[in-house]
């Protein structure tokens, strides 16, 4: 399996995925939990060819929602400028939020979306 499989999985569960090149994908994401609930943002992910063995690292978020704060702790820290070339032109942020227990999941796009929801819920 590879990046194309994650793209297919995301599309199967209703996400309009765009392939940006350099291993990067993006899609509109309706935030349903936490203090940003009700907003639709763009989530960008750097997906390796080793999907689903390894998940994407943290998400790129656009527009910027939190102050850049690389040194602080979860849930308000680990916020950086964009790190993947296709996301740099549009601004936004990279949130250092790796999945905490990927091996304990089915390693699916649904599991990664659940992780995103957990990240947003922690910002309540």
Predicted regions and their residues:
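Proline-anchored loop/turn motifs at beta-strand termini and strand-loop-strand connectors
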Residues: 44-52
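Strand-helix-loop interaction patch of compact alpha/beta domains
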Residues: 1-39
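Preference for bulky hydrophobic residues occupying beta-strand positions
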Residues: 27-29, 45, 58
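Hydrophobic, Leu/Ile/Phe/Ala-enriched alpha-helical segments that form helix-helix packing faces
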Residues: 6-14, 47, 116-123
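A short, structural micro-pattern
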Residues: 37, 52-53
């Amino acid at each position: 399996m590879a990046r194309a499989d994650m793209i297919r999985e995301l599309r199967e569960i209703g996400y309009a995925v765009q392939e940006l090149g350099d291993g990067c994908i993006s899609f509109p994401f309706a935030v349903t939990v936490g203090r940003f609930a009700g907003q639709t943002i763009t989530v960008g992910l750097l997906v390796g060819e080793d999907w689903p063995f390894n998940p994407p690292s943290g998400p790129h978020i656009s527009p910027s929602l939190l102050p850049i704060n690389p040194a602080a702790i979860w849930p308000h820290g680990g916020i950086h400028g964009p790190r993947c070339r296709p996301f740099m032109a549009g601004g936004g942020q990279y949130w250092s939020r790796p999945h905490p227990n990927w091996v304990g999941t089915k390693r699916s796009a649904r599991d990664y979306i659940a992780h995103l929801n957990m990240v947003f819920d922690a910002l309540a």
